[in-house]
């Protein structure tokens, strides 16, 4: 089993960000139950880049916490490239405070959530959302974090 991480830090200050080892662990714990080999780029960005990407790809005129860009290999070509995650530092930090969550747990949740999107999971329909949230909760708890949706369930 091997998950290859390409970590890109496109922020002014790297202080307080999770380590490359933490990002790699979160990816590995999320992806390897579904596929043994994968390459994922995780790009940490500021609000301006997140906003521009969110507007361009989703038509939403604001920054967002995580964007997932699954890689689609040309027909007949086998590659381990799963895709890219773009995570906005300021949004993650702000949401952790607003949702009263430990910052490290929220970073981990964004990696888990985004990775599941790369694997084909979605939350557009209620049944899909329930399945995806259940998986996220299970993975987070296996890594020692609390249920990321606990506040919404109370």
Swiss-Prot record:
Transmembrane segments: none
GO cellular component: cytoplasm
Any GO MF annotation of the entry: RNA endonuclease activity
Binding site for Zn(2+): 113, 117, 123
Pfam families in alphabetical order: YbeY
Top EC class for this record: hydrolase
Compartments reported by the entry: Cytoplasm
SUPFAM superfamilies cross-referenced by the UniProt entry: Metalloproteases ('zincins'), catalytic domain
Principal subcellular localization: cytoplasm
GO biological process, one term: rRNA processing
Gene3D superfamilies reported for this sequence: Metalloproteases ('zincins'), catalytic domain (3.40.390.30)
Alphabetical UniProt keywords: Cytoplasm, Endonuclease, Hydrolase, Metal-binding, Nuclease, Ribosome biogenesis, rRNA processing, Zinc
InterPro entries attached to this UniProt entry: MetalPrtase_cat_dom_sf_prd, YbeY, YbeY_CS
CC cofactor note: Binds 1 zinc ion.
Needed co-factor(s): Zn(2+)
Enzyme Commission (EC) number: 3.1.-.-
PANTHER family (alphabetical): ENDORIBONUCLEASE YBEY, CHLOROPLASTIC
Function, in words: Single strand-specific metallo-endoribonuclease involved in late-stage 70S ribosome quality control and in maturation of the 3' terminus of the 16S rRNA.
HAMAP family for this protein: Endoribonucl_YbeY
Protein name: Endoribonuclease YbeY
Organism: Vibrio cholerae serotype O1 (strain ATCC 39315 / El Tor Inaba N16961)
Lineage summary: Bacteria, Pseudomonadati, Pseudomonadota, Gammaproteobacteria, Vibrionales
